[in-house]
UniProtKB/Swiss-Prot annotation:
Entry-annotated residues carrying Phosphoserine: S318, S353
Name of protein: 5-azacytidine-induced protein 2
UniProt keyword list: Coiled coil, Cytoplasm, Host-virus interaction, Phosphoprotein, Ubl conjugation
Primary localization: cytoplasm
Residue numbers spanned by region Interaction with TBK1 and IKBKE: 216-257
Tissue: Widely expressed. Abundant expression seen in the pancreas and testis.
InterPro entries xrefs: TBD (IPR024581), TBK1-IKBKE_adapters (IPR051891)
GO biological process annotation, one example: negative regulation of canonical NF-kappaB signal transduction
Record keyword Ubl conjugation present: yes
Localization per Swiss-Prot or TrEMBL: Cytoplasm
GO CC annotation: cytoplasm; serine/threonine protein kinase complex
Modification comment: Ubiquitinated via 'Lys-48'-linked polyubiquitination by TRIM38, leading to its degradation.
Amino acid sequence: MDALVEDDICILNHEKAHKRDTVTPVSIYSGDESVASHFALVTAYEDIKKRLKDSEKENSLLKKRIRFLEEKLIARFEEETSSVGREQVNKAYHAYREVCIDRDNLKSKLDKMNKDNSESLKVLNEQLQSKEVELLQLRTEVETQQVMRNLNPPSSNWEVEKLSCDLKIHGLEQELELMRKECSDLKIELQKAKQTDPYQEDNLKSRDLQKLSISSDNMQHAYWELKREMSNLHLVTQVQAELLRKLKTSTAIKKACAPVGCSEDLGRDSTKLHLMNFTATYTRHPPLLPNGKALCHTTSSPLPGDVKVLSEKAILQSWTDNERSIPNDGTCFQEHSSYGRNSLEDNSWVFPSPPKSSETAFGETKTKTLPLPNLPPLHYLDQHNQNCLYKN
């Protein structure tokens, strides 16, 4: 556009200079024709001037507009380029930051994994070492066992043990079968008892209570007799110990020079020892009812309490090999005041308290226990033992 404007201006300037240079020719024509042509030229010239001026104005306006648009475009381009660059820079910075964070996290994870691997390697090495030691120990044990087996031929003890174990298992199986049979029998009896009348149940309960009271009384009586037997044995052992002490201390020379009184004392002691062989026998007394009458049973079949008493009597009679019966002169054993204390103030002979009738009820309801029969005075054997000890 500038080039076009410059060309127009140059044309105008050239025309002006040409006009100045040209000399008006002498009119060859007549006056009317020259005037008309001159007027046409002037009008054409003026039109051309007007057009040139208008074109110059348009050119200036266009230049201004072009400059404004150029500035606007440049500003827009700069803004676009600056915004895009900032966004890209921000994106790149964020990406770089994320990459750095990931790198740090991966480094920390790698360090942890390295530490864990090192610790696990240490633990595995220790375990391997311990296992190797155990293997060495086991190998040595196996080698020693092989050597022992080579030296000593294998015995048949394991066969004997196997047979004994089989016998035990067989016996236990038989016992289990018996217990099952007993359990089934008891269940059948229980069902039958449930089907019976309540009156019969009351009778059975009363009989059970009477049996329990009888067994408790018999047990107490057996306990006191056992206590007396133990006291007699204690006295006999003391006399024997004294005799042995005398025999050890006395030498053969003293025995030769000893007076007649010493031999008499030894004879007396030996007679005392013969007297000590008497033991207490167990006599079962029927318990008394609250009305003072003795309890008697019409049936001839023995009660479970009687069987228990017989077993207790057998245990008591096993204390001595040659048991003699004490003459039945109407007197029975009675608890002496000295039996509550330790015999001869010896702490090693302390007897436990007798079982109570309430404790032998085996979880039954508390009932009124039958009173024990009054025991007669002490037998002459206990008094004889005490007299012997007093003299010694």
